[in-house]
Amino acid sequence: MVGGGGSGGGLLENANPLIYERSGERPVTAGEEDEEVPDSIDAREIFDLIRSINDPEHPLTLEELNVVEQVRIQVSDPESTVAVAFTPTIPHCSMATLIGLSIKVKLLRSLPQRFKMDVHITPGTHASEHAVNKQLADKERVAAALENTHLLEVVNQCLSARS
């Protein structure tokens, strides 16, 4: 795994994380099923996209670790903007950039191209939040990271369904 740790048998940075209960699935409304009614993208839809992303260090999802929460997602469908704040489980988490990159890739693959995305660390929750946020906001650095075969493989593992 990137930065050591991972599920490859190395030492875990946060060996005993708090585990949170998953929220229920969102009920589908009649309006959402009606193809004639425009369906705007909202915070719950974004949360549903990212909640099941796997943590790179633990066999748990970002929702189960409370790394992502619906209340920290801002969406403006008319302005085509999405902002996701995520909270690493510990202030010195070396996986923060990888987690942010995984969220960003999931959104890039799932949302229409018109959307501008801001994926960042919840303010005050990580020792290197400004450096990580700067990396995640830099389109060229994100594109270069995704050209790295090993890193892309790790991101894809985070995005794949657990068996």
UniProtKB/Swiss-Prot annotation:
Gene3D superfamilies from the xrefs? 6.10.250.1280, Fe-S cluster assembly (FSCA) (3.30.300.130)
Q: InterPro entries annotated for this entry?
A: FSCA_dom_sf, MIP18, MIP18-like
One GO biological-process annotation of the entry reads: chromosome segregation
Q: Which SUPFAM superfamilies match?
A: Fe-S cluster assembly (FSCA) domain-like
Task: Enumerate the PANTHER family for this protein.
Answer: CYTOSOLIC IRON-SULFUR ASSEMBLY COMPONENT 2B, CYTOSOLIC IRON-SULFUR ASSEMBLY COMPONENT 2B-RELATED
Q: What's its job? A: Component of the cytosolic iron-sulfur protein assembly (CIA) complex, a multiprotein complex that mediates the incorporation of iron-sulfur cluster into extramitochondrial Fe/S proteins. As a CIA complex component and in collaboration with CIAO1 and MMS19, binds to and facilitates the assembly of most cytosolic-nuclear Fe/S proteins. As part of the mitotic spindle-associated MMXD complex it plays a role in chromosome segregation, probably by facilitating iron-sulfur cluster assembly into ERCC2/XPD.
Annotated protein name in UniProt: Cytosolic iron-sulfur assembly component 2B
- What gene is it encoded by? Ciao2b
